[in-house]
């Protein structure tokens, strides 16, 4: 984040984002017994837990402008297991798009790290602006597309590959269980 801030201070138009896995998962996930850690092989790799609060600070301060997903789901059986015996053959990436909004809302807004307005900015408006789609996208306004997510912030669900409410992807695990 420091390099992004320094670049912007020099007048460089620098953009930085993060993904849910870096806010909620850490390198201990890659150290699970057996081959389970292969589920968490991604680029960049998961870091130590203390990095998560630094990323949340970056989101709060505007150093990180958006939260994407790098959604790249591979089934553990059949695909990730291709790397048994050869780390370089583990497909790089994991599922992320399906739980993004609830993770960021709960970890950010409910967790007291960001405001509801900042939540909307980092999950919708900022990306629309960066890609030149605003105000057609990324806002609720006359003349804008009605791309609306109806989200119940009070609903409680347990994220699980076995929960049909939280898991619709054709992948055999959920990184956030």
Model region roles, listed by residue range:
Residues 26, 48, 103, 159-160:
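General structural signal for secondary-structure boundaries
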Residues 39-50, 90-95, 170-177:
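A short acidic, glycine-rich active-site loop
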Residues 37-40, 61, 66-67, 73-151:
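His/Asp/Glu-enriched, well-ordered alpha-helical/loop segment
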Residues 49, 130-133, 167:
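Short gly/ser/thr-rich secondary-structure transition/capping motifs
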